[in-house]
Every structure is written in C-alpha cells, then in structure tokens.
Design a protein with these regions (language model features):
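Short amphipathic alpha-helical face segments that pack within enzyme cores
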Residues: 41-45, 193, 200
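Active-site acidic-Proline motif in GNAT/NAT acetyltransferases
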Residues: 27, 187-188
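Short beta-strand segments enriched for Tyr within beta-sheet-rich domains
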Residues: 109, 180, 190-198
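Extracellular/lumenal ectodomain signal focusing on beta-strand-rich modules
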Residues: 88, 165, 243-245
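Pseudouridine synthases involved in rRNA/tRNA modification
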Residues: 1-20, 26-30, 174-176, 197-272
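RNA pseudouridine synthases
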Residues: 1-163, 170-175, 255, 261-271
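Short histidine-centered loop motifs in beta-beta connectors
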Residues: 182-185
Length: 272
C-alpha cells in the first residue's frame, strides 16, 4: 500500500479564481503527463486538484488511501477537468506556471502569450561573470545536428529568431569558483532558449546537464547511469533556473503580477 500524500505536496498555489490557476512548479516535475504514475506531471496534479482522481481503481477503491477516499481535500468528479498551460517550463526549471480552467480564459490568455504581452522574468545562477553586465542576446536557434541528443538545440545562423535580455544582480564565490546571479528576460519563447543563450556567452547555468559543457551528463541521466561523482560535479540537484514572475495587462488596464521565490537550495547557494 502506498502512503497517503498531503495536499500541500500536490500543488503550490500562487493564485486562483474561476478562470485562472497559477502555481509554483517544483524543479524535477515535468509539465505534461507521462506513463509512470498519475503524480509525475503538473497537468495530472492540476486535474487532481480540480477534483478528478485517476488514483481510483473502482468505487470506494483509491490506491493511495486505505479507506478508499481521495487523499486530498477536493470535491471529486468523474469528468476530466480542462487544464491548459499558458506557459511551460522544462523539467528541472522551477517557478510560475499560468493555467486556465475554461476555454474562454484559454483563448484570451493564449492570445496575450502569442502576442508577447505576457512578460516573463527568470532568475539564473551561472558560472562566471557576463560581459557586459547587462545586455541582449539576439541569436537564432535551431537543431544541434552534431549532438547525440535529439532534443538539443544550438545557436545557428539559419535558426529561428530568439532574443534574451539579462542583467547581473551580483557575483559571488564558492570554493574558489566565481558564479553570478542574473535576472533574465526572454523576449521570445524558444525551446531551451535561456540555457542556450547563457551558455553561448560563456556563462552556462549551474547544474545544466545538457548545455553545461558536457552533454554526456544528460545522456547518463536519461539512461540511469549518472554517478554520485557526476552529481557532485554538477554542484546543485537541478539546473539553477527559476521562472520568478509573470506580468500582463488586462483589457481594462489593470496590471496582473504573479511571483514566487526560488527553492531553498537555489536561494542558499546564491546567498539570497
């Protein structure tokens, strides 16, 4: 019998109303469902939070609960709730994810996102110090045809336009190595954009297994071969990228801002 899990382990809710549900996605959680278990993705957890319990094997039989009830304090439903992610984050990236509960909200928010009217602020811990201390990286991205990793992209002149602004918050040292805390402002939303652009200027995100300089770390991770020594060299448990804030202006001129702090391991390493 699996142990009952607490509701606070299900979702970290930043804001909720009848149309929107904004959450703080933890590092290590994928956004979309996988074939492993019903808690392994953000979408599955959002459905459970809204009352749909896929843990139930039959009437009065929930695999996580000895008495057959859903282990979270939710009003149960047999209908799979609508879950639409307006923005998505990589598995190891933590932070703000904006989701909608109905089709009209999905249409409105999706339009704002496509038009670039939802502004995103990230925080990253990188190796080294960027020069200049603030700037705009305007470099197109496309498939990395020389990589063994199918999902890996790179800066290439025939790629899709991508722009990332950054600003140095401060630099600091750990064990004789210099790191920097950056505020990062992506103007476009390409796959792995921030990680690629920061690596391209010589400041890879700390803990990045794919763009940190040796993609064998990523291959060993997905193939279950990542050793304790490799994890030690990566320094942090996940790559140090956090979606700090989403901001947009509503049709009637009101500014909406959703924000959350980085996880404790991130804050501790950066001295925040």
């Amino acid at each position: 019998m699996l142990s009952i899990r607490k509701e606070e382990e299900l979702l970290r809710v930043i804001y909720e109303d009848d149309a929107l549900l904004v959450v703080n996605k933890p590092a290590g959680l994928v956004c979309h469902p996988t074939k492993t278990d019903c808690l392994s993705s953000l979408v599955a957890r959002l459905r459970i939070y809204q009352g749909y319990c896929p843990l139930r094997m039959g009437p009065g039989d929930c695999i996580y609960s000895p008495d057959g009830s859903c282990p979270w304090n939710v009003e149960e439903t047999d209908t799979v709730p609508l879950v639409n992610l307006i923005n998505r984050l990589d598995r190891e990236t933590s932070g703000v994810v904006l989701t909608t509960k109905n089709y009209e909200a999905a249409r409105v928010m999706g339009k704002l996102m496509r038009e670039g009217k939802i502004k995103k602020t990230y925080q990253a811990i990188v190796k080294g110090v960027p020069e200049p201390a603030a700037g705009l990286i305007d470099q197109p991205l496309g498939d990395d045809e020389e990589s063994q990793v199918v999902v890996k992209d790179c800066v290439r002149p025939d790629g899709t336009p991508a722009r990332t602004a950054y600003r140095l918050v401060r630099s600091f040292e750990r064990d004789g190595v210099t790191y920097s805390l950056l505020d990062v402002f992506p103007d476009t939303g390409r796959k792995h954009q921030i990680r690629i652009h920061l690596a391209w200027i010589g400041c890879p995100v700390v803990g990045d297994k794919l763009y940190g300089g040796d993609e064998r770390y990523y291959l060993d991770l997905v193939e279950g071969r990542l050793t304790a020594e490799q994890r030690r060299r990566l320094i942090l448990p996940w790559h140090a990228l956090h979606a700090r804030c989403l901001t947009y202006t509503t049709w009637d001129g009101q500014t909406r801002r959703f924000e959350c702090e980085p996880e404790p391991w991130f804050r501790e390493f950066a001295g925040m």
